[in-house]
């Protein structure tokens, strides 16, 4: 941007605080009141200035045309099967929201629209949240979000007739709908109705409720609460034989939880894991054996089983921790499917229910594999694959012999995978830690210090940043740019320790990892500070904001999206 451009004024006030003995100036504190007339006017002036600049840019029209081209294409989600029906989300490419589709068969038949979120509101601000189908396949509970809010309104629809029941469920947040095995209703998490503005109230003291079909929410049954622990929140699962209810209790955002269990022969939930000693994620059950993913004494993850018999609870590890972090665990056709991460690349292994290794899934490409959802008795399931240059492909796999065929693949106009290349590099951060860095571009360009570079990062909340196809990144590469994605500490790429090394008092490690990614790129002859942009969203927005202040000399442009700052 030219130096003679007149930026809109940003007023500075005199706010000064002492935090942990450090004097901190916060000259823009007034912007935290984002509903004030002054903040609103500031936002409008900033947007007007930005739009004026972008319209003058010589590349805006070219980039816009390329974005239109790459965005013009269908997309679907990985299907899941229930009650001999196939469900998936579908978008023709120009819909604001994907539609939930349903096939009334397991082979070849026409798909029909089950729920169209584009019909929820004229301006498209209402979106479809979670969905849950009753065990008998008659009902679907689905939630609606207004303007991206975490608050959800649940509705219930008859799948055959498409008729909605009269009742709605309000003030639900961070919750699914878990059906009773007899199809009588479902469990959900409810908060008290806010008394203040929705964005100002603190959400505490949730209740686990049961909603019975055909009744109003006022009649819902309270299943569990703990007023002495206002930060706790709940999710519930039910064993396959309907004998045990598994209550997972979280405390804030920590990736550890408690497990309480209520069996049919007990009146109350009994604490089985009552300390925050690790993450315990319920997978499924066989008879009275419950299977969990756990990080207790296993930072990379393991599979463990809880046998419930005559009021006793006995734990046994089924698959021990390995050198690779576990990304996901599924049990399909009585086979345990583990998705390991080997330097951010998916490695799939199959085991029997006793933990004996059956087979390695030797997929022909390197990248990210997801899916393998389904029930313990399902004979088939679906998985997906992509990387930074390969559009998404979805496969149907036979879980008897592990053979698979393409179910659907993303097709883009004039896109040839062979025209691009992606490589995994490693660099050393400030403290010597080795960090993965995926670098992608057109294969025929000459990369030097003049090459535009987009450096992306996240680094937090136990979320892995893995190879995946992005139309935004593709458009950047089509303009001759390099996309560099760093898998920073704070995520789960290398297990729980990798996460802990980038959180709380270790957060500076994440900022250092990101800065040293830029230094590595420039030292390798990939771009320069004058040609580098950094980008991140949410926690990644915080990352970019911190990097703007700590290392402004390493880049020209910063894009902090919806940062948690």
Predicted stretch roles:
Residues 198, 231-236, 245-250, 293, ...:
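Hydrophobic alpha-helical scaffolding
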Residues 1-380, 386-392, 396-397, 401, ...:
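Beta-propeller folds
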Residues 157, 189, 211, 248, ...:
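Generic beta-strand/beta-sheet core signal
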Residues 138, 452, 556:
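Conserved acidic residues
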Residues 118-134, 144-149, 163-167, 397-538, ...:
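Cap/lid segment of the alpha/beta-hydrolase catalytic domain
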Residues 553-563:
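A conserved short beta-strand
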């Amino acid at each position: 941007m030219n130096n003679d451009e007149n930026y809109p004024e940003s007023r500075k006030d005199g706010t000064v605080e002492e935090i942990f003995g450090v004097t901190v100036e916060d000259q823009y504190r007034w912007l935290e009141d984002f509903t004030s007339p002054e903040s609103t006017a500031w936002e409008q002036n900033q947007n007007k200035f930005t739009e004026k600049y972008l319209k003058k840019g010589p590349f805006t029209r070219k980039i816009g045309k390329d974005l239109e081209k790459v965005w013009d294409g269908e997309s679907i989600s990985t299907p899941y099967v229930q009650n001999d029906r196939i469900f998936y989300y579908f978008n023709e490419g120009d819909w604001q929201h994907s539609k939930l589709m349903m096939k009334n068969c397991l082979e070849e038949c026409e798909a029909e629209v089950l729920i169209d979120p584009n019909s929820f509101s004229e301006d498209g601000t209402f979106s479809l949240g979670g969905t849950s189908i009753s065990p008998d396949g008659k009902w679907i509970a689905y939630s609606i979000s207004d303007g991206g809010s975490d608050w959800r309104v649940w509705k219930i629809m008859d799948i055959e007739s498409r008729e909605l029941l009269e009742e709605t469920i309000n003030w639900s947040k961070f919750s699914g709908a878990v059906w009773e095995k007899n199809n009588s209703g479902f469990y959900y998490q409810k908060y008290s109705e806010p008394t203040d503005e929705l964005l100002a109230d603190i959400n505490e003291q949730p209740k686990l409720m049961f909603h019975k079909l055909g009744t109003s929410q006022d009649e819902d049954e309270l299943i569990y609460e703990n007023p002495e622990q206002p930060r706790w929140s709940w999710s519930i699962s039910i064993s396959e034989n309907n004998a045990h209810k598994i209550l997972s209790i979280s405390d804030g955002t920590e990736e550890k939880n408690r497990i309480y269990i209520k069996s049919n022969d007990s009146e109350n939930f009994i604490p089985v894991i009552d300390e925050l000693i690790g993450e315990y994620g319920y997978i499924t059950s066989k008879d009275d054996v419950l299977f969990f993913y756990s990080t207790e004494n296993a930072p990379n993850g393991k599979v463990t089983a809880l046998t419930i018999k005559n009021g006793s609870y006995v734990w046994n590890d089924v698959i021990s921790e390995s050198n690779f972090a576990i990304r996901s665990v599924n049990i399909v056709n009585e086979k345990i499917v583990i998705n390991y991460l080997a330097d951010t690349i998916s490695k799939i292994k199959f085991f029997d229910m006793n933990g004996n290794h059956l087979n390695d899934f030797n997929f022909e490409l390197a990248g990210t594999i997801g899916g393998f959802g389904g029930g313990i008795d399902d004979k088939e399931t679906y998985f997906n694959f992509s990387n930074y240059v390969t559009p998404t492909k979805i496969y149907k796999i036979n879980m008897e012999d592990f053979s698979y065929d393409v179910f659907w693949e993303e097709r883009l106009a004039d896109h040839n995978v062979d025209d691009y290349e992606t490589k995994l590099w490693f660099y050393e951060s400030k403290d010597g830690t080795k960090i993965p860095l995926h670098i992608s571009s057109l294969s025929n360009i000459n990369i030097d210090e003049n090459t535009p570079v987009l450096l992306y990062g996240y680094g937090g909340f136990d979320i892995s940043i893995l190879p995946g196809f992005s139309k935004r990144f593709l458009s950047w590469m089509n303009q001759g740019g390099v996309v560099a994605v760093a898998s920073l500490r704070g995520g789960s790429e290398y297990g729980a320790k990798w996460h802990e090394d980038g959180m709380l008092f270790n957060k500076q490690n994440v900022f250092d990892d990101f800065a040293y990614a830029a230094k590595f790129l420039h030292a390798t002859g990939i771009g320069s500070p004058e040609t580098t942009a950094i980008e991140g969203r949410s926690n990644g927005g915080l990352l970019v904001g911190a990097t703007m202040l700590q290392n402004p000399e390493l880049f020209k442009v910063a894009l902090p999206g919806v940062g948690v700052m």
